[in-house]
Amino acid sequence: MEVHEVEMVMSAVAASQYPTDQLPEIALSGRSNVGKSSLINKLINRKSYARTSSKPGKTQTLNFYRVENELYFVDVPGYGYAKVSKKQREKFGQIIEAYLTNRDNLRGLISLIDGRHEPTDDDIAMYVFAKYYDIPVLVVATKMDKISTGKWNRQEKIIKEALDFNPVDKFVCFSALTGAGKDTVWEWIEQQCDIGGRR
């Protein structure tokens, strides 16, 4: 999709605060500092619309980005950040679970995993959770510009084996630096949201 119009509409922690205009929604989840904001910025062709940070745990609410008045990207709180209190982690978990299990507008989940490493227990738990609730998943391996392209297939195999990856889902290697994988991500989003591509 060629993006000209995007708006960060709201931050929410409860269903009563979600948008009410019935547009399809794509959630983005991942470990703190995995690159969710960088992916969003690349998808919408902005350098810093979604604020990136070297400080993990910055996203603490569900952030709704309306794109071309056709869909929402929903940036959910990152998980696995040790310096966030146990109580705060539990709160984040409740916010995410309530959204993913009860939101009728949700069309799919983009699960971001650091492509340089094996998935963490939290990464695996998120994937298993999504599959249990029959949420379509696109697994995006991020930071792939840190790895030589000759090793991408090996890393993909490692990640898929750790997740017990379901072939019905989609997997893509992504680089925020080069944009590799961007078009594949958009194709999946357009398919899930039943909107026409204008790349």
UniProtKB/Swiss-Prot annotation:
Its cofactor is Mg(2+). Gene3D superfamilies: P-loop containing nucleotide triphosphate hydrolases (3.40.50.300). SUPFAM superfamilies: P-loop containing nucleoside triphosphate hydrolases. GO terms for biological process: division septum assembly. Pfam families: MMR_HSR1. GO terms for molecular function: GTP binding; metal ion binding. GTP binds at residues 30-37, 57-61, 75-78, 142-145, 174-176. Residues 22-195 form the EngB-type G domain. One of its GO terms (cellular component) is cytosol. The keyword Plastid does not apply. Mg(2+) binds at S37, T59. Keywords: Cell cycle, Cell division, GTP-binding, Magnesium, Metal-binding, Nucleotide-binding, Septation. HAMAP family: GTPase_EngB (MF_00321). Belongs to the TRAFAC class TrmE-Era-EngA-EngB-Septin-like GTPase superfamily. EngB GTPase family. Necessary for normal cell division and for the maintenance of normal septation. This is Probable GTP-binding protein EngB. It comes from Latilactobacillus sakei subsp. sakei (strain 23K) (Lactobacillus sakei subsp. sakei). The gene is engB.
